[in-house]
Structures are given as structure tokens and as C-alpha cells.
Amino acid sequence: MAHTIKSNLSEHIIKIDVYGCGGTGSHVLNGLARMAKALNDLGHPGIHITAYDPDVVSYDNVGRQAFYDADVGQNKSKVLIQRINLYYRQTWRAITKEAPSSSKADIAIACVDTISSRSKIAKAKYKSGAYIIDCGNAKASGQVILGQYQGELPFPYEENRDLVEGEEPDEPNCVDQYYRQDLFINSMIAGHALHFVWSLFRRTSLDVRGVFTNLERGITNPIKC
């Protein structure tokens, strides 16, 4: 059954939280900057982003994530938001902390890679009906799940308990990261997440609320509403 999108998403500046600014989150932020420009061109009031991440850029992040050599040593959320604000004339915010315990965002996008971080996001309080998008990946596969907090769509972490329960994944080092995780899986997952955000603004209803994708097998399966 199709999900009817809330009509007020086109009536005012939409607040979007991004939790995690690394592999997937850095690509999501850059895509949101392009989306903001497109929405303004179409007459939409626009979006305002608050990005959360306590981590700093390491040399290992350059290339896989949307960072450069000059960014090494700087906080991930700050360096990305500063760049976007400069190039796109935005006033977005960077918070050098983990996701908050409560949020007034209209849309929250989780781009974290640990069960503990997801658990905190799952326990947080959001606006009734706020859209929550979970992004995650393994070596060459991943998922993007769109849900709602106290809304018509299921809350992603109630429906998918494996995202917040179980053992933490091992952290790859700089030598084996390219063997343990496909170079383009993060940007692929980010692209799917951005498509859902764009659809919330540009469509009146959704038939699909998520995807499971596998690069090695060339398969993407939809999660239908």
C-alpha cells in the first residue's frame, strides 16, 4: 500500500539531521548540498542541515570518504559543513558530538557503522511523524530503510532489530580496508538514501520505502510500503 507523504514538507524550510559524516555520511552531505540548490531553483524554501560526528579525519579516510589530504586532523562534520557553507552559501551546522538524545528534525539520516551508535539513535526522541532513514553496509552489500517515528511507516529499528543488537563489526585498518569493503559501496548507499529524501520533496506518495543492494551480485531489491 502506498505511503502518502506529508504535504508540509514543501511549505517551509525542512530540518534534516545527519548522524555520522564518514563513509556514507560524507557522500550524503555533499548530495544534500546539491539537493538544496535544486530545491531552491524549483521554488522550495530549502533545507537546513545539522551534521553530527565526533571523529577527526585520518589519512585512511582520504579517498574512500569525501575528504582530502588537507582535511586530515580536522573534525569530519566541521570540515564538510564549512566547505558546503562556503561553496553553496549555506548556514548549516556542524556538531562535534554523537547523535543527540532528542531531535526536532523533520528528517534524520543515520550513517553510522556501529551497533552502539545505532542503539543511541534508536532510543532518541523525535518529532511525531519524523522520517528516519537508516543507512548501513557490509563488504559489498547494504541497506537503506526509510521509516517514521510514531508515524504510518514502521520505525526502522523496531522492524530490524539486528541493526541494534548483536556483535560489533571489526574495524578494518588502512591495509585491508580495500579488501574488506568495496570502494564504492558507501557512495551507492548514499545515492539510494538521497533518492528517498528527494522523493519526499518531489512526490506525493511512495510505493517503496527502502532497498537491499548487493554490488557483487548486481542486485537491488526494494522494500515495499
PLM regions and their residue ranges:
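Conserved beta-strand segments of alpha/beta enzyme cores
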Residues: 48, 91-93, 131
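Phosphate-handling active-site elements
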Residues: 39-44, 204-206
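N-terminal Rossmann-like NAD(P) cofactor-binding module of classical short-chain dehydrogenase/reductase
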Residues: 109-110, 133
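Glycine-rich phosphate/adenylate-binding loop
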Residues: 2-24, 28, 104, 115-118, ...
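Glycine-rich phosphate-binding loop and adjoining beta1-alpha1-beta2 segment
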Residues: 45-88
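N-terminal Rossmann-like NAD(P) cofactor-binding subdomain of oxidoreductases
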Residues: 32, 43-44, 52, 112, ...
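Glycine-rich adenosine-cofactor-binding loop
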Residues: 12-42, 50-58
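A structured beta-alpha segment of the ubiquitous adenosine-cofactor-binding alpha/beta core
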Residues: 72-105, 112-117
